[in-house]
């Protein structure tokens, strides 16, 4: 039986995971990853579980097809999942189509004790009862049970296509209707460019893309419901402010390319102390001498530089972060806590929600802690991103006042 008998309501587990690394080293990383994932499942015993993956299939999807199949089969048939008798899996495998491919994978699992679960058909505009296990992987564009979009080409930096977009599904559980949106936003192409301005040019691109998604999911085409948006937002710390703080007493040396005079490296040295190098910055190098600053007290001293969400504070809510930056961890399977020196560590992987969804998460009749927001595999190599999860319970009756509106019981 999922959930503890003493805790009423429906237990929900939302997980986001950028899994690109898993398919580059499946032998070592997948076993670790699945073990840690199942552990979280065992601890929280959800009735409904959603796993949103980005970069599914890794850097080279075609070469990873067999690993993808194996991963999906393992998830669906493992002992840890045997009580989940209904599942929906949506994999964007259309890697040959530049204008459509997002490399997103969305997995939804329903516990056998959960009754009357409905999923929305966006074409028919009605809810359908969820039965059995189904996998969709060819052209998700024609699947009526979801909406998938890649961002318009002019949203992409320099209009260069990359695998960024979103997938939306809608569910009705315990008379509560809500959207679950899997999202992957744009990364920082260059540490040097990110450092130039505050906020960075990349943060502006992400802001525009996230605004686009939020506008799409509350537009006039469908009834408005609560929503959870979780994925790899690629949110970064404000680079200029972070560097100023980490290097307060340092002097900066600029290295330029001989032929173009372009800045290729910044070196920050202490004024005394034998002019010790504190930080080296290149396009894809962020080499700070003391990584502990990102781990001590879970890096929370750096949260003041995590500003990208503040623009959306009237539309999106997030529980307090008490876990270290989720990216970029070493991909060496023997290194579980080490960051790579490619980027400034940041909380890229997040679970955000609409203000009405916040009420759903925090509404509880008891005083006990109702929600857990944390990362998975703190001491184990999970690839370059640590998955992040939110576990909560939908309180009994939370959706009752709206049940007639959602027409969840009007099923085809």
Curated annotation (Swiss-Prot):
It comes from Mus musculus. Expressed at high levels in cerebellar Purkinje cells (at protein level). Expressed in Sertoli cells of the testis. GO terms for cellular component: dendrite; membrane; plasma membrane. Interacts with TASOR. It is a lipid-anchor. Residues 410-412 form a propeptide. The gene is Inpp5a. A lipid is attached at residue 409 (S-farnesyl cysteine). Belongs to the inositol 1,4,5-trisphosphate 5-phosphatase type I family. Its EC number is 3.1.3.56. This is Inositol polyphosphate-5-phosphatase A.
């Amino acid at each position: 039986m999922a959930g503890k008998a003493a805790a009423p309501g429906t237990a929900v587990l939302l997980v986001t995971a950028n899994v690109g690394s898993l398919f580059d080293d499946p032998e070592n990383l997948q076993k670790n990853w699945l073990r840690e994932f199942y552990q979280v499942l065992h601890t929280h015993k959800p009735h409904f579980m959603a796993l949103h993956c980005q970069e599914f299939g890794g850097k080279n999807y075609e070469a990873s097809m067999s690993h993808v199949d194996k991963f999906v089969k393992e998830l669906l048939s493992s002992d840890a999942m045997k009580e989940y008798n209904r599942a929906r899996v949506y994999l964007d495998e259309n890697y040959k189509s530049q204008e459509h491919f997002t490399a997103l994978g969305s997995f939804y699992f329903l516990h056998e004790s959960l009754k009357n679960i409905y999923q929305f058909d966006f074409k028919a505009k009605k809810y359908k009862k969820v039965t059995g296990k189904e996998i969709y992987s060819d052209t998700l564009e024609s699947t009526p049970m979801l909406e998938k979009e890649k961002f318009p080409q002019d949203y992409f930096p320099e209009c260069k296509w990359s695998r960024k977009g979103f997938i939306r599904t809608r569910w009705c559980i315990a008379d509560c209707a809500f959207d679950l949106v899997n999202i992957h936003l744009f990364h920082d192409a260059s540490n040097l460019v990110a450092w130039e301005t505050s906020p960075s040019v990349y943060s502006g691109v992400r802001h525009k893309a996230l605004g686009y998604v939020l506008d799409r999911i509350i537009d006039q085409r469908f009834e408005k419901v609560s929503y959870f948006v979780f994925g790899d937002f690629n949110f970064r710390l404000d680079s200029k402010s972070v560097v100023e703080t980490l290097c307060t007493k340092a002097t900066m040396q600029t290295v330029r390319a001989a032929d173009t005079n372009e800045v290729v490296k910044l070196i920050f040295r202490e004024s005394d102390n034998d002019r010790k190098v504190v930080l080296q910055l290149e396009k894809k190098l962020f080499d700070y001498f003391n990584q502990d600053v990102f781990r001590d007290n879970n890096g929370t001293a750096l949260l003041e530089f995590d500003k990208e969400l503040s623009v959306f504070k009237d539309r999106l809510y997030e529980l307090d972060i008490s876990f270290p930056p989720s990216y970029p961890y070493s991909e060496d399977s023997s290194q579980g806590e080490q960051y790579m020196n490619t980027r400034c560590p940041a909380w890229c992987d997040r679970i955000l929600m609409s203000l009405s969804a916040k009420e759903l998460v925090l509404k509880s009749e008891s005083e006990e802690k109702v929600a857990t927001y944390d990362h998975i595999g703190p001491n184990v190599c999970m690839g370059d991103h640590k998955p992040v999860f939110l576990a909560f319970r939908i309180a009994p009756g939370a959706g009752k006042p709206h049940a007639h509106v959602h027409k969840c019981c009007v099923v085809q």
